[in-house]
Amino acid sequence: MIKFNINDIEVEVEPGCTVLEAARQYGIEIPTLCYHEAVTPSGACRLCMVELKDGDWSKLVASCIYPVAEGINIYTETERVQNVRNWIFQMLLAQCPGSMEIKKLAEKYGVTSTRFAIQNQDEECMVCGLCTRACEEIVGLSAISMVDRGVYKTIGSPFVQPTEVCVACGCCVTICPTGAMRSRIDTVRSTPPVTLTPLAL
């Protein structure tokens, strides 16, 4: 077992555990959007940032991918963490103004507006890749993937062409943290629209 501290409270977890998993075991809340227990974590959304301190030295780490280690000191609500979280929420509100899920989570942490320019009022996708990982790791397919790059990056079928690889299992719709895949699923399939039966995760 590994012993370390979260918010000055000593905790004990199994080796190989991440900081986020440890925090959840002890009922310590850390916000996330791109994390799901069923797939490999990626740290894409960065909402789960926490502060790792060692004396006068400290750094921010993504708790969903940072492994626990003996004797480390983790803080989840320092001023630095809250400032970074605030900025991330503001960027997500500008990137995904159409997502009620993001708005609700941001409001829970005191963020109700953004200083950044909004390009598309209907956009919901934050391009975290959770849906693509679920399609590959849970379903065993790669019907969807990251398309394009930079500010043009989005989620879609390879080469932005309808594909027969999609089996309409609904896994991507179920796991999507922002609700974006609800409106995108029919653009992926090459067959007519179907009624999805979401996969229980």
What are the residue ranges of the model-derived segments?
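Extreme N-terminal starter segment of soluble prokaryotic enzymes
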Residues: 1-3
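N-terminal cofactor/phosphate-binding cores enriched in small/glycine residues
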Residues: 11-60, 64, 69-70, 83-84
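A generic secondary-structure micro-motif detector
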Residues: 9-10, 162
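Fe-S ferredoxin-like electron-transfer domains
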Residues: 46, 50, 56-168, 174, ...
